[in-house]
Amino acid sequence: MANNSELIKQCEMVAKEWLSPSFDEQTRKEVQAMLDNPDKTDLIDAFYQNLEFGTGGLRGIMGAGTNRMNKYIVGMATQGFANYINKAFPGKQCAVVVGHDCRNNGRMFAETVADIFSANGIKVYLFESLRPTPEISFAIRQLGCQAGVNVTASHNPREYNGYKAYWDDGAQVLAPHDKGIIDEVNKVKIEDVKFEGNKDLIIPIGGEMDWDYIQAVKEAMVDQDVILRQKDLNIVYSPMHGTGRVIIPMALRSWGFQNIHVVPEQMVIDGNFPTVVSPNPENAEAMTLGMKLGTKLNADLVIASDPDADRLAIVCRNPKGEWEILNGNQTCMMFSWYIIANKKKLGQLKGNEFLVKTIVTTEVIAEIAKKNNVEYMDCYTGFKWIANEIRINEGKKKYIGGGEESFGFLPFDKVRDKDSPASICLICEIAAWARDNGKTLYDLLMDIYAEYGFSKEVTINVVRPGKTGADEIKQMMTNFRENPPKELGGSKICLWKDYQTLEAKKADGTVEKINMPATSNVLQWFCEDGTKVSVRPSGTEPKIKFYTEVKDPSFKCAGCYERCTKAAEDKIAAIKKSLNLE
């Protein structure tokens, strides 16, 4: 990287602009140190590109540079966003909601955002302190705002922060707005940013919105009677040092649960996440303290939310009494099954309901929907695409749930992003229903596998940081397109999908168009035995993801679980080998 003289020259030219008096002394010192360092790796990583809106908006490591999260990048993004909002709603007194999570610099970034919006004549509803992502989405809709910003990096490591841009429906921005905002942001120079806020246009919000949101979350409840019968369900909850502590214990009590215990060490708000390596519910290590307390209290289940409380983790007991962490696919399966089965039983299905899942999420959900005559829809990764299906079908069909394999689910339509407070309340209702029927969540999972088919899903992450890494990832996708695999771990591929061209090619050579609202840099391969592999570069992190799913039709009951899991793991190892991912 350091020998690329043209790239170094370009980065130095951009970096020198950051030595102007428009930037504070600390920033100038940090940039000068990178310029003076003979090793230009840090300089290139900090300045080789501008942070772009991916599936989750802006997200990056905090520090000086165009490719870093800092108040200037946040400022220019907000100035561009403000310009776009004012152009999109000419002559209107526009309003936005601004919130943040527990991350370092989060409050400073949120106040910077609020100042810039207000300086551009836009009314700002600024949350008085940290709040869950779904509450910010809810508030945009509740207050009739034109847009919103949430300062969060979700579950990323402590070095990161981010910026999620929302539109007037409470969902993250999609085309044409995302491109329009980027165009406006790219026009902005640092001297264009109006950093001096108009305090008269900044309105603090907090407790009243919390109450409205908690009342709305109760709409996700399916069967109140089962909660009343099992109100002593023994629940352990952790907010993982984040925003869930503000809302989730209250929400659980509002549903009627009375036996709620919290992990005290993780109730401390801290952007350094001192008790975990990474505050990611996908990592088993992050659940260690919760499981320890759950064992001590003989809890029925352990649940957690990530720092911005959009995603959740669920831990239940297996027949040996050991803790079993459900993965994101299992979580979505369980929600989908329970919502459909119990709404049907209670006569709540009218025939116009639909579920949504992302294309990389397990196909078992499709089986659950099909067997129960409920429509399901596939969409791209990123919850904004689930929100898009809700928006398209609003007034025509009834949304009853949607989720993705990365531990996100939304069980009602008053919010347009993944919602861990609502999902955590609902999983506790499901656990109560299971206990009411002499079962555990684990038993329920086995029942679903027996009825709808066993599948094992593993996401393989290939990390390639920096500029060279981005080039490697691009080349991998090019190679897969030019030389697509013919088999996966010994299974013949019968269908190749390319969402860049929106073409699906069958083994007999016939090609069909894929019906999606936009193109996306995703490849999918389907085998005759039900094996599925989806390949996509991450929109928020320097990695390429391989989502693998393997079926086993021999699963008949819980006693088959270990054998089928082992066989599936062997199959996935063979798939990795065939794709040279070892």
Regions found by a protein language model. Name each.
Residues A2, E6-V113, I202-I235, T243:
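An N-terminal, well-structured beta->alpha segment
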Residues W18-S22, Q26, D42-L51, N161-T288, ...:
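Gly/Ser/Thr-enriched, mixed-charge loops and adjacent short helices
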Residues F47-N67, A153-N156, I235, P239-A251, ...:
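Conserved phosphate/anionic-ligand binding catalytic regions in large, soluble enzymes, centered on
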Residues V97-Y160, Q258-I314:
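N-terminal small/polar loop signature for handling phosphorylated ligands or for N-terminal nucleophile
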Residues R107-T112, S137-R141, E159-A165, K194, ...:
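Short acidic, glycine/serine/threonine-rich loops at helix termini
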Residues Y166-K194, N329-N352, K357-E367, S420:
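Glycine-rich phosphate-binding loop plus the immediately following alpha-helix
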Residues T295, A299-L301, E322-E324, N342-R536, ...:
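Phosphate-binding and adjacent anionic-ligand microenvironments
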